């Protein structure tokens, strides 16, 4: 597997949880002898929702909510078989979405 690279893309609503998970992945990859590029912070997506406060009549009274999706990108260059096995066994937090491309 010397000419391949693994691209890992992580998404989460909580940036602290995301950074902890990224740290675990980077430590695991470096321990097994692979080169790591990243973590690269990708743009944060902000979804804003505007909701009427009351059930009827008052259109001018509104409440605004937003949800932020934080993203990180990690490239693992020259992964070994040990790296792949260690990443498969890694247990990350429930609030982090992980996409892996070979």
UniProtKB/Swiss-Prot annotation:
NCBIfam families: PRK00596.1, rpsJ_bact. SUPFAM superfamilies: Ribosomal protein S10. It comes from the Bacteria. The keyword Ribonucleoprotein applies. Belongs to the universal ribosomal protein uS10 family. Involved in the binding of tRNA to the ribosomes. Part of the 30S ribosomal subunit. Disulfide bonds: none annotated. Pfam families: Ribosomal_S10. The keyword Ribonucleoprotein applies. GO terms for biological process: translation. This is Small ribosomal subunit protein uS10.
